[in-house]
Structure formats: structure tokens, C-alpha cells
A protein has these predicted regions:
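Short, acidic, metal-binding catalytic loop of nucleotide-sugar glycosyltransferases
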Residues: 204-207, 274
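Distinct, well-ordered alpha-helical segments
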Residues: 195-201, 226-233, 296-298
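N-terminal pre-core extensions flanking Radical SAM catalytic domains
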Residues: 1-158, 176-177, 349-389
Length: 389
């Protein structure tokens, strides 16, 4: 087996600064490595000056060798699960993209998934303080969730966010991005990132084959960029705007709390005008199917069909207590939609031990701290959870 990410990919999407081959890699085994040899440890952004040469470090070489022998490394369990169930994993999608376009340039950084910082105006229920400053500001909620082992980043501070932000800019400034083929910029919310415009200018200067380069911005849809930013974005011929939208109207406001649905709906319609004018190559959703919304997917697909935005769906396996795979398959199958991608996710035989008591506790705590009531916006899902404890 081969994975482009282990040879030329980097994902930097949490405030600990872990340098993973892709965002799906579960690098706990690297983080727990106690060997003194620095080449054996998971590198972080705070340990380096540049991304150049990163894939020659021991953890990456070991991943490359394991895959070449036909074995999925421990950190690649999510792709292993998806491929076993017949889904097109991140590994397969990226390999196909690079093979179709003959995009490989050995020894270079070609695939990036980064958060320039974690400034965010939302507190999504499946997120955590390591990826959202809004979450990081909710100290009491984080303490309560930690009592139930529900938060992976327990004590984020403004100082840590700022340290990451400046170190990220320093490392990117020292990195050769001339052969970049794909970048996904997320957050936080990218349009709030302090260095977003600076980074767009760097990409515009350095990428030597812009026609072979895809720029993807992952946004929660709450921000429509100012003209100077928009003009710079529209210079890239392969611009993709991806909306992290898992529901509509009141359920959307509950799951991804912080901004009213009317604002998000209006912004997406503005982006659609640029798509219709040929200025944006794709508008697409990344909708996470979780135990919070699995029964409401038909209304979501209808909405996006009506406004003319492509849909993409992602199964959630972590955190376990928000996964649909805690529910029996026959329960999930009652909510099939006729959409193959959604239905394949609903019917997948993925084994996750039920923790529905924790699911209810998580819902209760988030309700309390966001002044929302999940039961009022998805009573059916809450009842299903209770019936299957």
C-alpha cells in the first residue's frame, strides 16, 4: 500500500502543534513515545523551523514502511475502518487525485491541512478547546466535561493560542510551498485568522503551477470575507469553499452554536453568486453525520439541492459518545434517505461500544452552557438515545 500523505502531506490542526500526515491520523502512540531519541517522537510545530524534510523523520519513515508491507499503521485506523466498509478513505481519495494529475514531486510538501490559528465564533458540540477559541473560553464547561473524560484539550489559554499562531506563521514562512498541489485551510474559522491574508499572498507568490493547485477553505459559513480577501481568493483558479453544515435552522444553531442560521444561509447564497459567475470552482458541504442529526438528513439534502450546493458527508467515529454506531443497525436503518452516500454511512457495520449515558450527559452539559435545549430541536433523536440505553 501507498499513501501520499505519509510522503508529502502535513496536517496541523490542533493547538498542541502535532505534525500529522493527515488530519485523520490518530497519533496517540507517537505522543506517548518515551524514547529519548528525538527522531522517534512525534514532532510538533514548536520543535521545528520548517516543514521541509519532515517526511525523513523516523515516525514518517516507519509509516511509509508499514504501508509498503501491506499493513495499516496503528495511527491510520480511520482509513482502515472506512476501507473495510467499502468507503473511499482519505488515503484513496488523495492517491487518486495525485495519480490522475501526475502531481507527485518527490521530497516536497504537496498536501497541507492547516489551521493558521483557532480563533472561532462557534462552539460546535463535536469540537473541543484545541480547535476553537470559543470552546477555550468556556472554562467551567471544560472542567465539567473533563470529569467524564469528554474533552481532549482541557486547559487551553489565550497565551497558548497566540504562541501557536505566531509559530505557525514562522514555520510556514520558512517552508518551500512551490510544489503544493492541495491545501485545506480550516480553523477555528479561517476568515477570522490574523495571518490569513498574509498566507494567501505567500501562496500566490510561491506556487509555481497554480492550475495544478487546489485551495480549499473550510468555513462554518458565518463569515462573508471583506473585498480585499475575496479578491485574493478569486485569483486562484481552483478555489473550493467547503461549508461545515450538519443541519439547518434551529438544529444547526444548536449543534454548531454561536451564530444564527439566517446569517449562515445568507452568506452561502452570496458565495453561490460567485460560483454561478465561474469565479469559484466548487461549493460543497462537509456534513458530519452524528447521533445529533442522523435522523434529519433528508431535510439537509433537500435544502442544499434547492440552493444548488454540492453535498459531502463524513461519518463520525470519535468521540465515541457522539457516534451513530452506538445504536443498533436496525434503528439506524429506519432513517435511510435514498441518498447512497448517507445510507451507506447509516448502514455501515462499525463496532463502537455504546456509551449512551455519556451521550446524554454531554447533551445536558452543552444545553446548560449554551442556553439551548437539544430536546426542543431534535426530540426524536433524544428519544431514540434514551430507548437504546
Amino acid at each position: 500500500m501507498f499513501c501520499t500523505h505519509t510522503h508529502s502531506g502535513v496536517a496541523l490542526v490542533d493547538t498542541n502543534g502535532n505534525l500529522r500526515p493527515c488530519c485523520r491520523a490518530r497519533t496517540v502512540s507517537w505522543q506517548n513515545n518515551t524514547q529519548e531519541d528525538e527522531w522517534s517522537k512525534l514532532p510538533t510545530i514548536f520543535d521545528i523551523e520548517t516543514l521541509d524534510g519532515l517526511h525523513k523523520k523516523k515516525p514518517y519513515i516507519e509509516l511509509q514502511n508499514e504501508l509498503a508491507s501491506g499493513v495499516f499503521p496503528e495511527v491510520c485506523v480511520e482509513c482502515k475502518i472506512e476501507e473495510k466498509e467499502g468507503f473511499r478513505s482519505r488515503r484513496i481519495e488523495t492517491n487518486d487525485l495525485f495519480s490522475r494529475g501526475d502531481l507527485h514531486v518527490k521530497g516536497t510538501i504537496q498536501d497541507l491541512e492547516i489551521a493558521l490559528d483557532f480563533t472561532c465564533n462557534m462552539m460546535c458540540r463535536m469540537c473541543n478547546p484545541g480547535q476553537s477559541s470559543k470552546w477555550g473560553s468556556k472554562k467551567e464547561l471544560v472542567k465539567e466535561l473533563n470529569l467524564y473524560n469528554m474533552v481532549s484539550d482541557a486547559d487551553m489559554t489565550n497565551t497558548k493560542y497566540r504562541t501557536y499562531q505566531e509559530q505557525m506563521k514562522h514555520v510556514l514562512d520558512n517552508t518551500d510551498l512551490s510544489h503544493l498541489r492541495f491545501i485545506k485551510i480550516e480553523g477555528g474559522e479561517p476568515f477570522y485568522s490574523k495571518h490569513f491574508e498574509w498566507f494567501l499572498d505567500k501562496l500566490d507568490r510561491e506556487v509555481i503551477e497554480p492550475d495544478k493547485f487546489e485551495l480549499m477553505i473550510v468555513t462554518n459559513g458565518s463569515v462573508y470575507p471583506k473585498k480585499t480577501i475575496l479578491d485574493k481568493l478569486l485569483k486562484f483558479p481552483n478555489l473550493v469553499i467547503t461549508f461545515s453544515i450538519d443541519a439547518i435552522e434551529e438544529l444547526a444553531e444548536c449543534i454548531r452554536w454561536g451564530v444564527d442560521w439566517k446569517t449562515i444561509d445568507g452568506n452561502m447564497r452570496q458565495y453561490k453568486k460567485h460560483k454561478d459567475a465561474g469565479e469559484i470552482r466548487h461549493l460543497v458541504t462537509n456534513s458530519v453525520i452524528s447521533i445529533l442529526n442522523f435522523n434529519r438528513m433528508t431535510e439537509l439534502t433537500t435544502y442544499f439541492s434547492d440552493i444548488g450546493i454540492e453535498t459531502g458527508y463524513h461519518l463520525l467515529t470519535t468521540p465515541d459518545y457522539l457516534s451513530i454506531y452506538q445504536l443498533p443497525k436496525d434503528v439506524r436503518m429506519k432513517h435511510l434517505t435514498g441518498n447512497k452516500k448517507i445510507d451507506d454511512i447509516l448502514m455501515a457495520d462499525i463496532d463502537i461500544a455504546p456509551e449512551l449515558d455519556r451521550t446524554l450527559k454531554h447533551i445536558e452539559l452543552l444545553d446548560t452552557h449554551t442556553d439551548t435545549k437539544f430536546e426542543e430541536v431534535n426530540k426524536e433523536a433524544l428519544q431514540i438515545i434514551k430507548e437504546n440505553i
